[in-house]
Amino acid sequence: MFYAHFVLSKRGPLAKIWLAAHWDKKLTKAHVFECNLESSVESIICPKVKMALRTSGHLLLGVVRIYHRKAKYLLADCNEAFIKIKMAFRPGVVDLPEENREAAYNAITLPEEFHDFDQPLPDLDDIDVAQQFSLNQSRVEEITMREEVSNINILQDNDFGDFGMDDREMMREGSAFEDDMLTTNASNLKLEPEQSTSQLNEKSNHLEYDDQYKDDNFGEGNEGGILDDKLLSNDAGGIFDDPPAMPEEGVAMPEQPVHDDLDDDDNVSMGAPDSPDSVDPVEPLPTMTDQTTLVPNEEEAFALEPIDITVKETKAKRKRKLIVDSVKELDSKTIRAQLSDYSDIVTTLDLAPPTKKLMMWKETGGVEKLFSLPAQPLWNTRLLKLFTRCLTPLVLDDLRKRRKGGEADNLDEFLKEFENPEVPREELRPQDVIDQPILEEASHLQESLMEGSRTHLDDTIMPPPPPKQGVKRDSLQMEPEPMPMMQEAEPQIEMPPPPLPPPLELPPEEPQSISDLIPELNLLPEKEKEKDEEEEEEEEDTTGTEQDQEERRWNKRTQQMLHGLQRVLAKTGAESISLLDLCRNTNRKQAAAKFYSFLVLKKQQAIELTQREPYSDIVATPGPRFHTV
């Protein structure tokens, strides 16, 4: 151990020092300011527990870092203070002139004014208090509200003291109003306001106190009134008579509109002129007037429309049903199928060709373009129409006519080759062209070989064609019909034909590749790949993980490579095999698989690999376990 445990404790004396030495970013500014370097250095020099030299060195590094942080913070504070002082006292900041930079003494000093508090107060007679008070006084008439009381000629007493305020006294003092109310008949329901008021005034003037008790109908049931049988008598009634509801006779409505416009509280006023004999209103009278409201006013004032009593129907809340899935768990097959299906996240790689020429060939290399466009672009639409008008497959018809004539043996093969001119080019895929642009020359050689074979076949079967026929086939590949416009495009499109005949003899001189000799070296051909993938899917469903399947696949490839190498060495008798020769005419994926197989065999000591210099050829020789693995 290079350190003691007390150093690493959070509350130890050297905790911050150790933290600064190993984790400087963890220290905050507060920790740096709180750290006392003097005590820390003393505890390092004279530790309580013996420390190793390495530990003391780490602690000294922490001391230096904390001191550096303190000096850095001090420098930053000094710079900030210096900048603020410099900004505050820089010349030219004050816009005032020099003479006005100092404030005047009177502007910043309060004047010393001592008032004389010993002066005598003025006499009260000097101030006209009454005049000032009279200005604020108002007359009694201005500040007192008038009591506007309507004169109701119902009660005869003007005397406030003689009139009893009790309900019992009011009922005892029968008036003409009570007399008329109780003695009214149905025949007197016709309203005559002027006549009734005059009669009421006369009665109220001539009634005496004894007559009131005589005619109050209290305890005498034979006087006759509303509740008596003499309802249809012709006795005179007042305006305030309460008529009974009689269906036999109609009620005459008043013709004066004065009573219609009055409220319930004003129905007691008949509009008669004020007289000295009129009686002042009393508190309990409104209840009596409510009881003597006229029927016409009742119909007009209180005939309201019937209220439609309908209760708003509230929608009943629907109970939410809990929907539970019948299948709560996915089985392993479904999950495995979802994981294996990655078609929605994988698309085909569509890369543009590396050169503009290849891009132009890719755009114009289709059948629809070759049958409608010349070898060079025609920007004029009229010329393009003239060109496409002459595009008719006459050669095929001519060949079919000759086939009927007896030249069918060789024509069958020629027609197959002519109708499928792209078969030799299938070896060079667009991906291979993108991945290996160096193989463009090889494609030209293949085209030249194909053209040479075609021209040879044409010479043997057909009459000698015009010199532009080969150019036509190279550009259109489906139109051997000679065109006059193609003669002009011949020198621009077909550059390589003159030097092509010599390379025709090159393929026999090239050595045959090792992979052609031994088919086992072509790791997992196309037909076997599909079977291998199907087997892998079946095995993946049963047992094993993806890593196991990958290892099994590489084991099969390495075994295939080992058997191929054994057969090559047995056939050729060579002592070594070159990886460059082995990877000839293969794409990158196949070359990488072969190289990986070499490495696996080298790990298993089946072969020995040697390389003279970086990026040079790798040579494989048999190892100690070449025949035993």
From Swiss-Prot:
Family of the protein in this entry: Belongs to the rad21 family.
GO cellular component: chromosome, centromeric region; cohesin complex; cytosol; nuclear matrix; spindle pole
Keyword Repressor: yes
Keyword annotations from UniProtKB, A to Z: Activator, Apoptosis, Cell cycle, Cell division, Centromere, Chromosome, Chromosome partition, Cytoplasm, Cytoskeleton, Developmental protein, DNA damage, DNA repair, Mitosis, Nucleus, Phosphoprotein, Repressor, Transcription, Transcription regulation
Protein name, per record: Double-strand-break repair protein rad21 homolog
Presence of the UniProt keyword Repressor in the record: yes
PTM remark: Cleaved by separase/ESPL1 at the onset of anaphase; this cleavage is required for sister chromatid separation and cytokinesis. Cleaved by caspases at the beginning of apoptosis. Phosphorylated; becomes hyperphosphorylated in M phase of cell cycle. The large dissociation of cohesin from chromosome arms during prophase may be partly due to phosphorylation by PLK1/PLX1.
Species: Xenopus laevis
One example GO MF annotation: chromatin binding
Pfam family, any one: Rad21_Rec8_N
Biased composition annotated in UniProt, kind: Acidic residues: 531-549
Superkingdom in the source lineage: Eukaryota
Site entry (Cleavage), positions: 172-173, 277-278
GO biological process entries: apoptotic process; cell division; chromosome segregation; protein localization to chromatin; replication-born double-strand break repair via sister chromatid exchange; sister chromatid cohesion
Region of interest called Disordered, as start-end residue ranges on this chain: 245-284, 447-475, 491-553
